[in-house]
Amino acid sequence: MSLDKSKHEKYVQILREELVPALGCTEPIAIAYTAANLRKIMGGIPDEILIESSGNIIKNAKSVIVPNTGGMKGMEASALIGLIGGNADKGLEVLADVTEEHVKLAHEYLAKSCTKLKLMDTPASLHIRITGKLNGDTGVAELIHQHTNIVLLKKNDEIIFEKPFSLESAAGALTDRTCLNVKDILDFADTVPVDEVSPIIMRQVEYNMRVSEDGLKTSYGIETGKNILKYNQKKGDDFSVKVQAEGEVAAASDARMCGCSYPVITNSGSGNQGLAVSVPVVVYARENKISEEKLIRCLIVSNLLAIHQKTGIGRLSAYCGAVTAGAACAAAITYMKGGSYEQVCGTIVNTLGTVSGILCDGAKQSCAAKIASALDSALFSHELAMDGNFFAGGDGIVKDDIEKTIAGIGVVAAQGMHKTDEVVLQVMLKD
């Protein structure tokens, strides 16, 4: 059954808002983007820089390589390369034009120790404020809730740009996600004219599979993706599409976490989650000779189910997004194979009832292994669901209704794991 026009338009707009290109891990890129905006109002590179951010930004920017920098890591590097070589007009591809000269200059500024870091006292999990001083002038650029949501640009006492925001809530910055539910997502995927969403979805296929291919042919980190295939995959009659999917998506994350210069298409503000909801679906479609139209409809399911789950959790938390992305991806594969609404719900429930609670301890090499592990459990959950085996309401956090289960996970992640998030950051920052 088709959705009403208003909800249909919202679903298309949500896909447009969430499936966007990003070059590099989105938290250090958000720092670089904020810094690039600061340079625009300062007219040059500040001599002194104060980088203030929420704990989750510190967590996710600490260990991941910033793209196009030759291996630079950390918040200072992210801010400096954004100030020196960033192009704020390119959004999450802010570092696309960085050159070797920019990187050399960033190292020189790092050597001057001109940057300071400060943990912000803020209820927002995604919050960045960068203050710079140059020739007696002071500039401020501030971003909150979404990775390109600049809310303040100020030079001395002059407000150059400002928009209202709430520290506690991201409501209003994007299309209201509360319209999402599993049944309507499936109805939308069944009925939306493919031409209406094809440019959005097929760009995700093109970008994310290119990164996966790069991860398989290039040495990145500990080569999780390559090694999954090396240790587990066999040719001929023993070929496993499940292992292939896990290897290809892990390889994509290997590349992304270790400085790959190709952009990916995100989901819920995360490149890794964008990879996790798309690459395995493409692999299953390829191996099962699924048509492009059906692939597009399956990727609609995967993307929107992931966004739906993340709505209650929030963009950044101590709850690893590989779990929700894996559940969404496996549910889309259930849909691909003709599974019913009950079987799609069962896939999600089985996954959330099994691997919920995997910690997010920041963006780094092991994200690839977490994605593969979550996907492995999710694909087993898919197999169980296809045979009619589902966890029942009352089994731990599982409720008797899919929407209640998803809402409960949101409460666990956003409220229950708040203290966990603080302790994880403390452990990460302690020698």
Curated annotation (Swiss-Prot):
GO terms for molecular function: L-cysteine desulfhydrase activity. Pfam families: SDH_alpha. One of its GO terms (biological process) is L-cysteine catabolic process to pyruvate. InterPro entries: Ser_deHydtase-like_asu, UPF0597. Coiled coil: none annotated. Transmembrane segments: none annotated. Belongs to the UPF0597 family. This is UPF0597 protein TDE_2144. It comes from Treponema denticola (strain ATCC 35405 / DSM 14222 / CIP 103919 / JCM 8153 / KCTC 15104).
